[in-house]
């Protein structure tokens, strides 16, 4: 009755409302004179009461269950699900935990889940190396060098990807395909490897040269920086001397012999690069780089691209988006524009409408269109600078300046009739409007103007949209750098081009189709800081 009374919302003196409704008046009066609880309820409440009374007391606490009382098999499963960095603290709790943490099953799972090691680790038993040794002395110790890096090789730069490969940590140098085959896959060669073949410590081996692995050294200088050193550079030498080394390097780097290269200036550039890069003997300093963060409203997915750069061959460029602009930063470079510099910048506010196919062949017509847009951009910048100067005096101390990644809003451009032009809205609006014909399968025909040189004549003949941009040019040794106008042409999700107006040259870029682990920036601010750092090294 007491339970029923609580459910019905009445006190114990009133009785059960549902039971009263079922009974007549006489039965109800009799029921009101009876106790509110039946014998069974009295027994339950009496057993829970203190001193045998009807007043209910606190329930006794449930019996405690210690982790120490769990079977070892269950403890192994629990410990194996924890991050490996937490397990040393767990081993200090008691002797039983420390003994269980010697179970290789735990460390085998941590190697697989944290570092992707899918090898059959049981074969390590032959060498006497445990999975715990692999985790602690190899994977965890060198975890800070996993990811993408740029070597400090003067203006040339490079792209190093350090990965866990089976029971090894290997540093792969990624190389562009041979010029001018920009759509071919990337090439790569190992520069060093780290493995654990004995229980004492991990072994670092230099892989440079053609005589197999030999002794090397790795030093983690500071956060996001490490260096490699070869202790047996004689393994890099070839029996035929420098001439044989140069011929071998040329065949690997360019896929041809010096006799195949008829351009004298190109021969000089190739020889200069060989002399400069070979002097390092794989003793290099690397700085971490991140892949650019992406947003749903980006023009295309940002990332790494291979691009044609005339006599310098193919180079690696990172495309990233920064508000109303897109930037192409060199990961590899040359004596004119070194690695780390911003090779192209695209103004997503200023679309360029190409003329019909016949007029596209006329370089003067394309030049006229681009220069008109450049003049419009200059006027907007002057107006924006004047407005910024007037507003600077009124700016309060709490008002923040826009960051480099979020440029100040510029005045919308005007069309010939005084109405806002198609390049005056938000970048997302311009991109959406430009993508409409492309999504309907109505991509605009495209052809290079007569007189514009291209290393690759097999460029797409249909484009989605074009934007005004600038390209960085300079003399040898990065002297007298200046930004010159050009046209950014978006072909598809994986290819774009840039017409260098002043050079009368065309660069074609194709996406690097590779998956990189441990390469995402922890934040957009960290990515912007990384760009500043690699640019400052060659400025």
Swiss-Prot record:
Annotated signal sequence range: none
Phenotype when changing residue 480 to A: Decreased phosphorylation, leading to impair ubiquitination by the SCF(FBXO46) complex
Coiled-coil segments on the chain, per record: none
Sequence motif: D box, positions: 64-69
Gene Ontology terms for molecular function: cyclin binding; ubiquitin-like ligase-substrate adaptor activity
Pathway(s) of this molecule: Protein modification; protein ubiquitination
InterPro entries (alphabetical): F-box-like_dom_sf, F-box_dom, FBXO31/39
Taxonomic superkingdom: Eukaryota
Effect noted on mutating residue 309 to A: Abolished ability to promote ubiquitination of amidated proteins
Name the record gives this protein: F-box only protein 31
Organism: Homo sapiens (Human)
